[in-house]
Amino acid sequence: MTNKCLLQIALLLCFSTTALSMSYNLLGFLQRSSNFQCQKLLWQLNGRLEYCLKDRMNFDIPEEIKQLQQFQKEDAALTIYEMLQNIFAIFRQDSSSTGWNETIVENLLANVYHQINHLKTVLEEKLEKEDFTRGKLMSSLHLKRYYGRILHYLKAKEYSHCAWTIVRVEILRNFYFINRLTGYLRN
């Protein structure tokens, strides 16, 4: 009985992973749902922007993200993947000075990690099957520099409450762009 149940679960997991990796529509649906959940969690983190206006900074998000051109599905998926990896790295930093509910931060990290894994599954399979080069993709160097500026800002401000409030708003803005990129994941 137990072996039969385990076999069914294993088959279901294999099927769902394969089905996910084959369908950008499903990926887009899951991505939109997860993006919404991440935005909701970010809004739950306290921090009043009006008290931190003196700490505002233009992190200069790459033009390729602000002015979305026609992205191929794979390009959009890879860009979202890179953005989520960097968001994950940012929220793994010391946020103890914020007074944020750690459960909310942990849920945010878990949600972002889950999205990263879904995208990784799709990207690995597509990269194996299709021959597309990183030359076609938006420069990930611009993204790395952008997120580097955010991390440098947090460090320079000694991970203060206001610095985190500014970064939280910037990451909310990131999810707006991720939502737009998610639109390119349709089959």
Curated annotation (Swiss-Prot):
Disulfide bonds: C52-C162
Key words, A-Z: Antiviral defense, Cytokine, Disulfide bond, Glycoprotein, Pharmaceutical, Phosphoprotein, Secreted, Signal
An individual GO BP term: natural killer cell activation
Positions glycosylated per UniProt: N101
Subcellular compartments: Secreted
Pfam family, one: Interferon
Gene Ontology annotations for the cellular component aspect, listed alphabetically: extracellular region; extracellular space
Range of residues in the leader sequence: 1-21
Reported effect, W164C: In a breast cancer sample; somatic mutation
GO molecular function, one term: chloramphenicol O-acetyltransferase activity
Gene3D superfamilies assigned: 1.20.1250.10
Family of the protein in this entry: Belongs to the alpha/beta interferon family.
Protein role: Type I interferon cytokine that plays a key role in the innate immune response to infection, developing tumors and other inflammatory stimuli. Signals via binding to high-affinity (IFNAR2) and low-affinity (IFNAR1) heterodimeric receptor, activating the canonical Jak-STAT signaling pathway resulting in transcriptional activation or repression of interferon-regulated genes that encode the effectors of the interferon response, such as antiviral proteins, regulators of cell proliferation and differentiation, and immunoregulatory proteins.
Subunit structure: Monomer.
Protein's name according to its UniProt entry: Interferon beta
